[in-house]
């Protein structure tokens, strides 16, 4: 039996994962299916593609094949088997045939009897930030493709599930629903469904781990004199004390008002941003002028002179 490069047959690389191999197989199986293709050698190519896939989809057989593929040009390979009997280099084709010829067909037959596991399915689920704070039940609707033995989609099966989203889930977290993926073939087990959580952007809060950040606008006099100002949280509103002399960028910690996690609850950080009022009228301008005269020693750009030596 002549050596066959199964990776080249499927058009994949030796480093590609099972998902890439499966995708290539289905594409080529549809291309060369005798009922679809008009090419003269379609049936032969179809069988070759199926043979390659049967070997590469199985981890153990793929490892054996990779070893043979790596050493196929080594004149010393195969001279000594695990049972101690010697082989000539010319026996390489016999080794390949024994492992991937009749043996392979026997493996295929056993695998067909055992059935093939269904595909795993992934889908994204968008939730609002507030919904992460308590367990939620969501109705999930999706469709599952059903493939025939030749890798072609026969039908789409619509499914509806009521799924519990646990409290404390984070963006990008995967929730596994066992057996809710694609159906198996020939009695094989169904695949799993993986829900990927996507938290919708919030108009007020930014997520930093289990903590939240909110930009807190304050008036110049609030920053200068200190004040108590209302600050929204995910559940309610609190009064936060602004210390006198606060600056833009200063962070004030509000303990326990962040995200509810599975092991801990984060904090909320209010980031101060001093906001100037609109263009002052005559009275306001006079007051600002008085302030400027009272604070003549204050130079907001003094650090520039230090940096310039």
From Swiss-Prot:
It is found in: Cytoplasm, Nucleoid. Its main location: cytoplasm. PROSITE patterns: DNAJ_1, DNAJ_2. InterPro entries: DNA-bd_curved-DNA, DnaJ_C, DnaJ_domain, DnaJ_domain_CS, HSP40/DnaJ_pept-bd, J_dom_sf. One of its GO terms (cellular component) is nucleoid. Keywords: Chaperone, Cytoplasm, DNA-binding. Residues 5-69 form the J domain. NCBIfam families: PRK10266.1. DNA-binding protein that preferentially recognizes a curved DNA sequence. It is probably a functional analog of DnaJ; displays overlapping activities with DnaJ, but functions under different conditions, probably acting as a molecular chaperone in an adaptive response to environmental stresses other than heat shock. Lacks autonomous chaperone activity; binds native substrates and targets them for recognition by DnaK. Its activity is inhibited by the binding of CbpM. This is Curved DNA-binding protein. It comes from Serratia proteamaculans (strain 568). The gene is cbpA.
């Amino acid at each position: 039996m002549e050596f066959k490069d199964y990776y080249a047959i499927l058009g994949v690389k030796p480093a590609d994962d099972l998902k890439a191999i499966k995708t290539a197989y289905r594409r080529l199986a549809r291309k060369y299916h005798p009922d679809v293709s008009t090419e003269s050698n379609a049936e032969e190519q179809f069988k070759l593609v199926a043979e390659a896939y049967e070997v590469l989809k199985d981890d153990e057989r793929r490892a054996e094949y990779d070893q043979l593929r790596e050493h196929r040009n080594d004149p010393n390979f195969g001279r000594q088997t695990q049972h101690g009997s010697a082989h000539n280099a010319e026996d390489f084709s016999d080794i390949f045939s024994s492992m991937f010829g009749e043996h392979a067909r026997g493996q295929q037959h056993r695998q067909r009897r055992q059935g093939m596991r269904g595909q795993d399915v992934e889908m994204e689920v968008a939730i609002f930030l507030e919904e992460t704070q308590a367990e939620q039940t969501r109705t999930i609707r999706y469709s599952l493709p059903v493939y025939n033995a030749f890798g072609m989609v026969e039908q789409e099966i619509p499914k509806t599930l009521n799924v519990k989203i646990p409290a404390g889930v984070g963006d990008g977290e995967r929730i596994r629903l066992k057996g809710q993926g694609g159906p198996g073939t020939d009695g094989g087990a169904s695949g799993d469904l993986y829900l990927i959580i996507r938290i919708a952007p919030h108009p007020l809060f930014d997520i930093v781990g289990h903590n939240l950040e909110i930009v807190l606008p304050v008036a110049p006099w609030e920053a200068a004199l200190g004040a108590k100002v209302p600050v929204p949280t995910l559940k309610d509103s609190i009064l936060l004390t602004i210390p006198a002399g606060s600056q833009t960028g200063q962070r004030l910690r509000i303990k326990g008002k962040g995200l509810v996690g599975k092991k801990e609850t984060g904090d909320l950080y209010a980031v101060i941003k001093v906001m100037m009022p609109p263009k002052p009228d005559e009275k306001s301008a006079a007051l600002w002028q008085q302030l400027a005269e009272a604070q003549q020693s204050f130079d907001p750009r003094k650090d520039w002179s230090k940096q310039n030596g």
